[in-house]
């Protein structure tokens, strides 16, 4: 059974995010922009996530809700992603999600486009 936690090993720190921004590839989809870096090693904790949410998205309440929805979508679907992947996700101002299902679909759609999903699904 996959671990559904979102501990320190699942998060990107600022130096790791800088590395993803400089060395990773960029993808756009469903109101999201993602920088993706495929690391050589596959650590036991799998994929890692970093979020970059700008003020253009709205008030703090809206920005924090978007971050919560994206973290939850990543947390529950991390086992579907290829291990050894670092993601930095930046929601664009046009994204209008009604709730978790929309955020989940946007994240999985982006991962599908970037070929980050494990094939055995």
Feature roles, as predicted:
Residues 1-121:
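Positively charged, solvent-exposed patches that mediate nucleic-acid binding
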